[in-house]
């Protein structure tokens, strides 16, 4: 793991470090370990074959390795101006750094975006993107299909969400959106979706969401992004 960090591939180094904790996180540790090793192998093979991959997939490989993208390069991408509803956020520990992932939905464009803010342990993260509010911002998206974006303004204007009635997806539609996301990026670990349904339990007694025609399992516990 340390060698990966030295090689400027910190995200891959983090994956290798986390392998030691798989047994503590999952009772089915052997299966989880095999799956993670398979993911790492796929990243390595994709890097070796990067010259033959489409640009979006190469960008996804760079992200999985943790190769940095200069802010100037991101801000050179076309801007997307909108009133963005902050639908949710999650704080994740990444070594000695805490990362806050905030999911934004553009009211005009219907686009999703993910803003990531970082702070060292014991430092306070900025509270710009608070769930249940909206921000007026011009975003620039990172290369690839990860939905990660960067705002032109360090402190965009914020306000309450008013007169917003989003059109939810049926559960089948949410599943199709996830399928398309994984097809475009095999390492995708989360995609936001607004769905309609009610709580239920599946045949195994696990909590799920149903709209009467399909069911979506609800899971908890450790994850990279939500």
Tell me the role of every PLM-derived stretch.
Residues 3-8, 14-53, 59-92, 99-101, ...:
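Long, compositionally biased intrinsically disordered terminal regions
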